[in-house]
Amino acid sequence: GANVVAVDLSPTLVQLARERKPYELGGGKLEFVSGDMLSTTYGRFDHVVAMDSMIHYERHDLVGCLAQLAERTGASMVFTFAPSNPVLAAMIKIGRLFPRGDRAPFIEPVSEAALRGVIAGHGGLAQWQVGRTEKISSGFYTSQAMELHS
């Protein structure tokens, strides 16, 4: 069984996750924490999964976060980003017409090619390679998962 640390900024979502956790996990351990996923207090990891954690970051900031995580990660990191496309760009422009309180949280569309370029050029990720990548689409939800492995 794996030892898992699940981190989210929202104490409300962390509490909800605790309530929904299965009672029997087998041989592993699951710890829910409200905080910053980039904090070094969580220790080292074999694998990191960051689902929709970085969709609000511009590509250089996103890669900076990955480099911070890479310092404490041994094997792989899987993360999602908002892939840029003309439909999403139009939706964001229309969304900006609404009052700020009525808008969904802002996402930062990122080109896969541009993201690959920033990853390849970042010294903190020199030992990491892009692995699998897959677009995820369900209804209005669209993201792209990317794997980095050392």
Regions found by a protein language model. Give the residues of each.
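A conserved beta-strand element that flanks and buttresses the S-adenosyl-L-methionine
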Residues: 49-50
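Hydrophobic adenine-recognition pocket in adenosine-nucleotide-binding enzymes
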Residues: 53
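A short, conserved alpha-helix within the catalytic core of class I
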Residues: 57-69
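Conserved beta-strand signature within the Rossmann-like core of class I S-adenosyl-L-methionine
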Residues: 73-83
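Short, glycine-/aromatic-enriched active-site segment of Class I SAM-dependent methyltransferases
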Residues: 88-105
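Short alpha-helix
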Residues: 105-125
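Core SAM-dependent methyltransferase catalytic element
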Residues: 131-150
